[in-house]
Amino acid sequence: MAEVDFGDTELFEQLDGDLPASSVHVRFDSEGEANDVQELVSQHEETINRLSAENQELKRRLSLLNRPSGLPVEDKLDGPLLQILFMNHIISKQYHQEIEEFITSLFQKYEEHRKSNSEKTSFNIKPQPSSILLEENDDSDADTMKNIKQAFSVVGSVQYFKNFCLDKLGQPLLNENPQLTEGWDIPKYQQVFTQIVSLDGQEIQVKAKRPKPCCFNCGSEEHQMRDCPKPRDQAHINMKRKEFLDACGEAGNQNQQRYHAEEVEERFGKYKPGVISEELQEALGIMDKNLPPFIYRMRELGYPPGWLKEAELENSGLSLYDGKERLDASDGEIEDRDTEAKKHVSYDVSKLVNYPGFNISAPPDMFDEWQMFGSIPMQQAHQKDIFANYLTDSFPPGSSNKSNKRSSCQSSSSERKRQKTSGNHTVTSAVMDMDMESDEDMYHSRASKGYMFHPPLPPGSPSYGTPPPLPRGTPPSTPPNFIPPPPPTPTPPPLPKGTPPPTPNRDSPKVPPQVLDEDTWTLEELEEKQRLLWAQLDNGESTNSDCDAHTPITVSSVTSSPSRTELDIATGRKAAPRQTAHELKSPCVITKLFVAEPEEGGPLIPEEGGPLIPEEGGPLIPEEGGPLIPEEGGPLIPEEDSETNEDSNECYVVEGNDIEVNKLSSKHENASEKNPSDEDATEEAACVEPSPKRSGVPDVSKFAEGITPFEYDNMSDSTGVYLRLRGLLKNSPRNVQKSKKQV
């Protein structure tokens, strides 16, 4: 074996500088070994020469594709558009200039398109994985290398022949979407098999697919039956429709599954409340000696309401009805409509869950880190036995809340009766709201200072700020600003028969009627007032229906004013009295008086040939020779004489506070004589002949002299609708028949 010398001796010899350097590295001991080595060296030299020639050829070819050195590129659009390798072909040689001009026209076309559509987004062309990067090994920064890679990536290499083309790299995708790229149409092939081939001895259950909708006439899936161009075959359509419905039913039955409570319990049976498993400890990242983080939060929020719902006792849910009342099947007691919504709730304390560290004591080796979590220590009120006693005492199984509900209803109803509508109820409600707000503020202030135990309330329970209901029999509370109503005005006793009424003096001051506010009336007074008004209406209807044709009218007025002492005075209108021609020769005074309601006695019925004198409690009408004495509060008619024409047929109608003069001409006399049927349509009144000592009725200008007008702003102006309606009712066939029967 030849001894190999690494040249270390020559190195040291050169360092010493004494001996000349020799270039002998390999030494051969025998001639045979030298010949073999020389043959190997010659072979390697041939291989090296061949590889060197190939390397030179590759460098020459690469120089055609490689990017020019030192060319700066700022963007990928600054790179080359394409690189053409012109082959030795007659077409490439002949149309070399046309190809270059076409490429130049493409540049111009792109620039024009970009200027016209500046807002349009350009395609994001990414090089495909098969692309080749034309790059030289140079020292450039990262941004420059990124632009070079994008600009000098060969994304396509196609060799075009006369009859075909050969694509070596494939076409890139536009925006990574094959639909936007030409040449990426994937052909659809027919399905060769329909079922999966199973192994030997195995059965594969293939799920039935839902049939696709198709035309029942021809079986095509491209159109519906109504658009089928072929003639309809009804028998074939019915058969295909039946097959489609059967297939849909089979596919639907496979998906129908029922879930039962037992299956759910078996599925989640390993999860138990209050028990921390090893998997949960690992998921929470806690050790065996650490309390779960939710325990500290439960100390602030209380017992979980979901598990409290699980401990709630359920009743049968059946209700018995007897037509009037409902019987609860749980306890057999009668339940009102008001208490139907509020059902009785009770709890089974044996179903309360044990939570170590919350309602039961934690093991002694566990750490209570409530300060680290910003919580509170374990509360004594959260103990399981204390909470169970609270549920048992507050929600016993056989108790009911009907008494509290009824007492609260009674107190609320009585309070509504006593409250005023003028504003006291607003004060009362405001005071109650202030009380409730103060209670809530106290609750929040206490909770902020220190933690207080508030056990969760069952559904339907009142909030903390709601005041408790009053016990049964408690009188309603009086509002603070309540003003008691004044006592009712006593009614003066009726005057005996023959007693002349007091004549008011013209100089005496007039006492205005006392007007009370309707807001001071209580509910009992309003009901009494309503009852009296209905009685007056019934009296008035019966009086109007029973009156004779020659009987003066007595109307019961219905008070529309809020005052209890006011009388509703109807406005007068012109009336044609029912008289003979002889009686109309002298002037007469027709007086129409309206009273509130005669307390004693009936309607005014005059005697034959006598004056109109009412019974007790009615208005007074003067006799012959006496002055006109009005009702109390009515107008004063002076006794002064006035110059009147005795031969003229004049009739003065006096109605309440209004005085009208009706001049009845001879035409009216003829009309009253010729048309007796029209007499019923007029107002019935009595004409009283004046005293022979008097020359006539005073002039119109002197009427209402010295009378204080009664003004009431809230009283609406009279339109006469009531009188017209009453006239229509009196002319009805029913009233006409009654009047004929009475005559």
From Swiss-Prot:
Biased composition (Pro residues): 455-504
Basic and acidic residues: bias regions: 666-677
Composition bias, Acidic residues: 638-649
Coiled coil: 29-67
GO MF entry, a single one: zinc ion binding
Region annotated Disordered, chain positions: 390-432, 449-518, 540-566, 600-649, 662-700
Localization terms from the record: Nucleus, Nucleoplasm
Zinc finger (CCHC-type): 213-230
GO cellular component terms, semicolon-separated: catalytic step 2 spliceosome; nucleoplasm
Keyword Zinc-finger applies: yes
Xref: Pfam families: PSP (PF04046), zf-CCHC (PF00098)
Any GO BP: RNA processing
Skewed-composition ranges (Low complexity): 399-413, 551-564, 601-637
Alphabetized UniProt keyword annotations: Coiled coil, Metal-binding, Nucleus, Zinc, Zinc-finger
Function: Scaffolding subunit of the trimeric nuclear exosome targeting (NEXT) complex that is involved in the surveillance and turnover of aberrant transcripts and non-coding RNAs. NEXT functions as an RNA exosome cofactor that directs a subset of non-coding short-lived RNAs for exosomal degradation. May be involved in pre-mRNA splicing. It is required for 3'-end maturation of telomerase RNA component (TERC), TERC 3'-end targeting to the nuclear RNA exosome, and for telomerase function.
Family: Belongs to the ZCCHC8 family.
Protein name in UniProt: Zinc finger CCHC domain-containing protein 8
Gene behind this protein: zcchc8
